[in-house]
UniProtKB/Swiss-Prot annotation:
Designated name of the protein: Eukaryotic translation initiation factor 4E-4
Keyword hit for Nucleotide-binding: no
Self-association state and partner proteins as the record states: eIF4F is a multi-subunit complex, the composition of which varies with external and internal environmental conditions. It is composed of at least eIF4A, eIF4E and eIF4G. eIF4E is also known to interact with other partners.
Organism lineage string: Eukaryota, Metazoa, Ecdysozoa, Nematoda, Chromadorea
GO CC terms, sorted: eukaryotic translation initiation factor 4F complex
Role this protein plays: Recognizes and binds the 7-methylguanosine-containing mRNA cap during an early step in the initiation of protein synthesis and facilitates ribosome binding by inducing the unwinding of the mRNAs secondary structures. All 5 eIF4E proteins bind monomethyl cap structures. Only ife-1, ife-2 and ife-5 bind trimethyl cap structures which result from trans-splicing. Translation of trimethyl cap structure mRNAs may be regulated by intracellular redox state; disulfide bonds change the width and depth of the cap-binding cavity determining selectivity to mRNA caps.
Cystine crosslinks: 143-147
Keyword set, alphabetical order: Disulfide bond, Initiation factor, Protein biosynthesis, RNA-binding, Translation regulation
This protein's encoding gene: ife-4
Length: 212
């Protein structure tokens, strides 16, 4: 019996949590977005948690295809500065999961901005408006953004598809500085998602200003 148990294969299954807000058609007077986006969030479950199970706990909130739908969903979220618990808020192109292993993310990486508590709401909202307004001018290269609420700081990251495309990755960094009006001495860190997979961490062992 013991031998049978020891060789038993355990298969992890992602819990496909139902979306909280139904997908709605774009109204005739709405301002349609170039891409469809999905809001979702993750809150760490109580007790023991395996990072490999992250995707199982991502709760989709709603899909937006227009500016009007974007704001109709935004009003249902607490602002990052109002959140106390450790959580991640995701804003990704529809069909792209907010995990390193997703085909759109696995060869990419992310620019990371660390913020003192109390500053994340303005930066986060400005970043989302820049994304839906296509201010980055890199098309499919952007995958999405994450706002991570932590005890000592908040962290905002912008994910791109191809970490090896230095000119585009560089352009994303400079556009981030511009649209968020960051001081020139603000440190932006970069981390490839294959490195995240190796060390099972999103924000440790980053590289500062990797693209010179």
């Amino acid at each position: 019996m013991e031998a049978e148990t020891s060789t038993q294969e355990v298969v992890k299954q992602v819990k496909n949590l139902p979306i909280l807000m139904e997908d709605a058609p774009v109204g005739s007077d709405d301002h349609q977005l170039q891409y469809s986006y999905t809001f979702s969030y993750f809150m760490r479950p109580t007790g023991k948690f395996d990072p490999e199970d992250y995707a199982s706990y991502v709760q989709p909130v709603g899909i937006m295809k227009s500016v009007e739908q974007f704001w109709s969903i935004m009003v249902h979220f607490k602002r990052p500065t109002e959140m106390c618990d450790k959580a991640d808020i995701h804003f990704f192109k529809t069909g792209v999961k907010p995990v390193w292993e997703d085909p759109a993310n696995c060869k990419g990486g992310k620019w990371i901005i660390r913020l003192k508590k109390g500053l994340s709401t303005r930066i986060w909202e400005n970043l989302l408006m820049a994304i839906i307004g296509e201010q980055f001018l890199v098309g499919d290269e952007l995958c999405g953004a994450v706002c991570s609420i932590r005890n000592q700081e908040d962290i905002i990251s912008l994910w791109n598809r191809n970490a090896d495309d230095t000119p585009v990755t560089n352009r994303i960094r400079e556009t981030l500085r511009s649209v968020l009006q960051l001081p020139q001495n603000t440190v932006l860190e970069y981390k490839r998602h294959d490195d995240c997979l190796r060390d099972q961490s999103s924000y440790r062992h980053t590289t500062k200003n990797i693209c010179k």
